[in-house]
Amino acid sequence: MGKIIGIDLGTTNSCVAVMDGGKARVLENAEGDRTTPSIIAYTQDGEVLVGQPAKRQAVTNPQNTLFAIKRLIGRRFEDAEAQRDKDIMPYKIVAADNGDAWVEVKDQKIAPPQISAEVLKKMKKTAEDFLGETVTEAVITVPAYFNDAQRQATKDAGRIAGLDVKRIINEPTAAALAYGMDKGVGNRTIAVYDLGGGTFDISIIEIDDVDGEKTFEVLATNGDTHLGGEDFDSRLINYLVDEFKKEQGIDLRNDPLAMQRLKEAAEKAKIELSSAQQTDVNLPYITADATGPKHMNIKVTRAKLESLVEELVARSMEPLKVALKDAGLSVSDIDDVILVGGQTRMPMVQKQVADFFGKEPRKDVNPDEAVAIGAAVQGGVLAGDVKDVLLLDVTPLSLGIETMGGVMTALISKNTTIPTKHSQVFSTAEDNQSAVTIHVLQGERKRAADNKSLGQFNLDGIQPAPRGMPQIEVTFDIDADGILHVSAKDKNSGREQNITIKASSGLSEDEIKQMVRDAEANAEADRKFEELVQVRNQADQLVHGTRKLVEEAGDKLPATDKSAIEEAVKALEAASKGEDKADIEAKIQALVQSSAKLQELAQQQAQAGEAQADTSAKKDDDVVDAEFEEVKDKK
């Protein structure tokens, strides 16, 4: 059985790890970095760039450079969050035919899972390069507060990337695994505060250690799937744009190129202000008008940045209170606080968390790598490489159905340990009703319309009876990935209907299969291109080597052989410019045959050189070694 890799598919950066010799190891990508920017670019010549190469060209290609796609995964176009992003992103967010939020690149609509699959493919390739074998299985992490649709869409992205997703696990839980495996023994209750590039989670986790066997039990989780470093960047960008407008009277929001440069500068300034008290945002030639070029030079202090993002940090505090209340604990019950996600490097965030819990967060857990390490540990558990670890996760939101009067009736409450199964009997609302619609919902509101709709299906063929008489048993079954399966059964007739909630991941089985085929076709095209390049290089080396030998042979090479070789070289050079691998290989063989006489001459010259070297060595052998004694002058 091959390795099951662990992937942290992040909003801003992604990371991959694998169990290696009993320990989780974070892998370096082709650029030598341990994290990869979750950025995908579609270039003018049809190439797809991922990670650092995509980030580098973002300034010149803002409309086709996609970042923070995780914020759109599993979302409807009309969702408030998607609408908010639509107004601030340089790329085009559009409605798909099924109402999902997709992205338009060069007049083509692309689904977020398909875009995220490009990042997953790079993670897969990074692991394959390290392991020296094909990787087909992975554990992928998601924010704890992701709903069913977002989890399903993440799983779809894995499939499109050619991965069998063995388990979807929550990011804070993965971070707790990384911490718990590394930090010795003893029972502890920890709080994982995870503020990443686009999402925020808080999980309260109990680690029980009995005779070296560790149980990680999530007691409660809460969060906000649209709060993260990208929002912090946006606040700073808006401030810089407004300041520039005051100074120069030009609104940079209408200039995608300037906005892309500003985005990079704002992110850099934010990072610098975690260690410095002030920084300069200096962008020469940011734009121009009739009076000439304009330059941006704005000083930003740490205090200014903190005042801009104060409300965002405060927003993360409310879920902390709810999670503690749901876990039935107070702050004094928390033994350790773990910070995860790049945005937690901001001193203001660290101070607010420390003030809330009354203790300093631990600094010995790498916020960028802990989640991938935990995912690799879970991969090791599933592969049987890691023993004595049990993970008990929870469902983040209540699940139920719409009942009479537009009310949501919960079948599974939030923070229920998964996997779990629950059934409840319902009845009809009208006399002689022959069918019922099961409308599946996720959320905490009483009114059905205020919750997230996960999908609906019909159960028909109910025998006519007065209202309230038929017995319809609805069963909710959540698997270990936190994905929901729902069935409804008429207890009288035995008729049953069931669905796995696909909801607004929105991709049908056929669409996913087509995307998998496209990805495989691209992989095949990439392989063929690589082979073609190798053959071209081989041809180039042969041409260079042959010309050198012709020069060295001089007059010793008969004129007929020389002209035959020159013809074969020209033919090979012409073939190398084309795309036909077989033709290049044939021309290589033709040149090898034409230069047989040349190879013979080269061999003879080499042997003659060796014989000469032997003769001079013999002469050296005749020299007698004499011992000598140093005579010192007498003084």
Swiss-Prot record:
Induction: By stress conditions e.g. heat shock. One of its GO terms (molecular function) is ATP binding. Residues 603-635 are annotated as: Disordered. It comes from the Bacteria. Residues 603-613 have a biased composition (Low complexity). Keywords: ATP-binding, Chaperone, Nucleotide-binding, Phosphoprotein, Stress response. The modification Phosphothreonine is found at residue 199. The keyword Transmembrane helix does not apply. Belongs to the heat shock protein 70 family. Acts as a chaperone. This is Chaperone protein DnaK. The gene is dnaK.
